[in-house]
From Swiss-Prot:
Name of the gene this protein is made from: rnp3
Protein EC: 3.1.26.5
Family: Belongs to the eukaryotic/archaeal RNase P protein component 3 family.
Substrates-to-products reaction catalysed: Endonucleolytic cleavage of RNA, removing 5'-extranucleotides from tRNA precursor
Oligomeric form and interacting partners: Consists of a catalytic RNA component and at least 4-5 protein subunits.
Protein name as it appears in the record: Ribonuclease P protein component 3
Stored Pfam families: RNase_P_p30
Keyword Cell membrane: no
C-alpha cells in the first residue's frame, strides 16, 4: 500500500523523513505530491539520484508526482500539458465544478484530489471519471485532524462521495493527505478509522494500493518496452 504525501517546501517534512516513517509503518511506497521536492524521474539529476537512494536505503518506493492547484480549468489544462510527460503521477486539485469536470474528462489526469473542496461531485462526473480512468481521491485527513462541525461536514461529504463512486464503479484512491511525517498513519490505522465511520475495510485498502498501481502503469507506459496495453516490444520486434 502507498500514501501520497506533501513534502518540503509544500509540507513540513522532507521526502527522506516521510520515506523513513512510511517504511516503518509498513507502506510499500510514497507518492510525493510536491513538485519542488523531487525532480522528475525522467531526468538524471541529484534529486532523481536521491529518490533512488531513498528506495535503496529504506526499501520503499518513492514516486515523483505533481499536484496541480489551478484557479480554473484553462490554467489546469496548461499545467497538465507541461507536467504529464515529466511526472509519473499527475493530480489535479478540485475546488469548483469547472475544475472537477475538467479533471474527470481529461485522460492525462491520474487523480482528482479533494473533489469536495468547494464544488460538488455528481453522477455525471463519476461516469466521466470511470470512462477516462481518472481516480477520485478520498481524503481521510479530517478523520485524524479535524474536530467538531468541520469533521462532521467532512464525513458527510465523504459518505456522499462514496455512494456515488461505488454506484458507478469509479476508480478511487485513499489518503490521509499528510503534510508532515507526524501526520502519517499506518495502513491499519487508516483502515480502522475509515471502517469506524462506515467504510468497507477492503475498499479502503484498494484505495491505498491504487496509488502504487497508477505509478506502475505510468512507468510502464513511459518505458521503451511499451507499445500498447497488453503488448510489449519483444527481442525480435523493431520499429516499422
Amino acid at each position: 500500500m502507498y500514501e501520497a504525501v506533501h513534502a518540503h517546501p509544500d509540507g513540513d517534512a522532507t521526502v527522506a523523513r516521510h520515506a523513513a516513517t512510511a517504511e516503518r509503518y509498513g507502506y510499500e511506497g510514497i507518492v510525493v505530491r510536491t513538485r519542488e521536492a523531487l525532480d522528475p524521474a525522467s531526468k538524471s539529476s541529484e534529486h532523481a539520484d536521491e529518490a533512488t537512494a531513498l528506495r535503496d536505503e529504506y526499501g520503499i518506493d518513492v514516486v515523483d508526482a505533481v499536484e496541480i492547484d489551478a484557479d480554473n480549468a484553462t490554467s489546469a489544462s496548461g499545467a497538465v500539458g507541461n507536467y504529464r510527460s515529466d511526472r509519473t503521477v499527475v493530480c489535479v486539485v478540485g475546488g469548483d465544478d469547472g475544475l472537477n469536470r475538467f479533471a474527470v474528462e481529461e485522460p492525462r489526469v491520474d487523480v482528482l484530489v479533494r473533489p469536495m473542496g468547494g464544488g460538488d461531485f455528481n453522477h455525471v462526473l463519476a461516469k466521466a471519471a470511470r470512462d477516462n480512468g481518472v481516480h477520485v481521491e478520498f481524503d481521510l485527513g479530517p478523520l485524524f485532524r479535524a474536530t467538531g462541525g468541520k469533521r462532521v461536514r467532512a464525513l458527510a461529504d465523504l459518505r456522499k462521495l462514496r455512494e456515488i463512486v461505488t454506484y458507478y464503479d469509479t476508480p478511487h484512491v485513499v489518503s490521509a493527505n499528510p503534510r508532515s511525517h507526524l501526520d502519517l498513519r499506518a495502513p491499519r490505522e487508516v483502515v480502522a478509522a475509515a471502517e469506524a465511520v462506515g467504510f468497507d475495510a477492503e475498499w479502503v485498502r484498494e484505495g491505498l494500493r491504487a496509488w502504487g498501481e497508477i505509478a506502475t502503469r505510468n512507468r510502464e507506459r513511459r518505458s521503451e518496452a511499451f507499445i500498447e496495453p497488453g503488448v510489449r516490444r519483444g527481442r525480435y520486434e523493431e520499429d516499422g
